């Protein structure tokens, strides 16, 4: 077993408490919190296999000891919307691409990923879904081997977990494609979406949709119990977006970007998402897509419970400056920006850990920023 000692641990109550964390085969087995007098007390009865706190006083019990004195210990981050990194893209539809992405993300503190597709032809999306299912099956088999104490390649443990697919296209507005290819935009189609869900083995978790498009509301009403619909890449006004949320949509794709903006007379998608109950909103906090003042305003409007930090990173993330590609389109990475040759922003080149750090730099309380990147 291993132990992380003396750290300020981010708890399920979104506060920091001094504690020791005991790990067994890379998983948390127990958390030993310290009382006001500095003595350790076991407050982790909800974690199976709890260890007597008194047994943790000897360092000889552990194969590895990490002294986190003066440091914060936080959960692994989650990125529910990114396309790629280190030269690979989810839409490459290869096991190698997903593996490289998962390795990079884990190296940067991201424990779980839900990578996004682009607006592409149906058959290409089917290939991407099949590839994700195959990768997930391999991932689950590895987990089964670990539980049975069978030999597992150590590298298998050093990858972020693939938890779903974010279908960012093709059911979007041709007038708000952003960096997507307008050639492959389609009207919302419940039958096609069901095929993609089936092909993925129910791995499709998020679906971006433009609610003003014909068939959108019907699609949301029919399938909202199977996937989480996200309003985005849309020209929808406040009323159209509100109808989508009333019909079962529960999310907003990269708030402010590729949608109608917030105006004092025309509140658009932003206003509708704010007013709808239980709707979460993505925020690309890379210092490029959103002004720091708007980041602060968004946390104030929505609250940390409803803001989800995302990276929306593309394959140039983690790579040197130069030419790259996104959805079949040429992208130029320069510094902390990635743009199409036309000048349109083409995703980010910052991972979600970097986005969390930016949020803190912009004045978001540390606990709120961590919460928005983990829960």
Question: Which stretches of residues belong to each language-model region?
Answer:
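His/Asp/Glu-enriched, well-ordered alpha-helical/loop segment
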Residues: 271-281, 287, 299-311, 317-375
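Active-site core of metal-dependent hydrolases
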Residues: 198-319
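Active-site gating loops and adjacent loop-to-helix segments of metal-dependent hydrolytic enzymes
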Residues: 104-114, 173-201, 245, 249-255, ...
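Alpha-helical scaffold segments that flank or form the walls of functional sites
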Residues: 71-72, 80, 90-160, 184-199
């Amino acid at each position: 077993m291993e132990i992380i000692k003396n750290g300020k641990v981010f708890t399920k109550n979104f506060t920091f408490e001094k504690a020791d964390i005991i790990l067994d085969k890379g998983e948390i087995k127990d958390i030993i919190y310290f009382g006001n007098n500095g003595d350790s007390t076991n407050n982790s009865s909800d974690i199976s296999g709890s260890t007597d706190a008194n047994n943790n006083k000897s360092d000889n019990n552990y194969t590895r000891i990490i002294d986190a004195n003066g440091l914060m210990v936080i959960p692994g981050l989650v990125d529910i919307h990114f396309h790629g990194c280190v030269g690979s893209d989810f839409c490459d539809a290869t096991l190698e691409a997903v593996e490289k992405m998962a390795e990079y993300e884990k190296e940067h503190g991201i424990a779980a990923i839900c990578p996004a597709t682009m607006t592409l032809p149906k058959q290409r999306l089917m290939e991407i879904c099949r590839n994700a299912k195959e990768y997930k099956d391999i991932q689950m088999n590895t987990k089964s081997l670990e539980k049975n104490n069978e030999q597992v390649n150590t590298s298998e443990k050093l990858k972020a977990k693939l938890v779903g697919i974010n279908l960012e296209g093709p059911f979007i507005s041709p007038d708000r494609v952003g960096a997507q290819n307008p050639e492959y935009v389609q009207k919302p189609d419940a039958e096609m979406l069901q095929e993609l869900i089936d092909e993925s083995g129910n791995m499709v978790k998020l679906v971006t949709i433009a609610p003003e498009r014909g068939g959108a509301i019907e699609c949301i009403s029919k399938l909202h119990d199977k996937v989480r619909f996200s309003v985005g890449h849309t020209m929808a006004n406040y009323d159209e977006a509100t109808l989508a949320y009333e019909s079962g949509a529960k999310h907003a794709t990269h708030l402010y970007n590729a949608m109608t903006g917030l105006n004092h007379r025309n509140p658009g998608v932003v206003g509708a998402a704010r007013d709808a109950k239980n709707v979460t909103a993505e925020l690309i906090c890379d210092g490029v897509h959103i002004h720091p003042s708007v980041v602060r305003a968004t946390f104030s409007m929505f609250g940390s419970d409803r803001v989800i930090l995302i990276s929306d990173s593309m394959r140039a993330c983690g790579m040197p400056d130069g030419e790259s590609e996104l959805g079949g389109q040429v992208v130029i990475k320069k510094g902390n920006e990635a743009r199409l040759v036309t000048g349109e922003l083409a995703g980010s080149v910052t991972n979600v850990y970097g986005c969390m750090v930016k949020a803190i730099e912009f004045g978001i309380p540390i606990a709120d920023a961590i919460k928005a990147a983990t829960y």
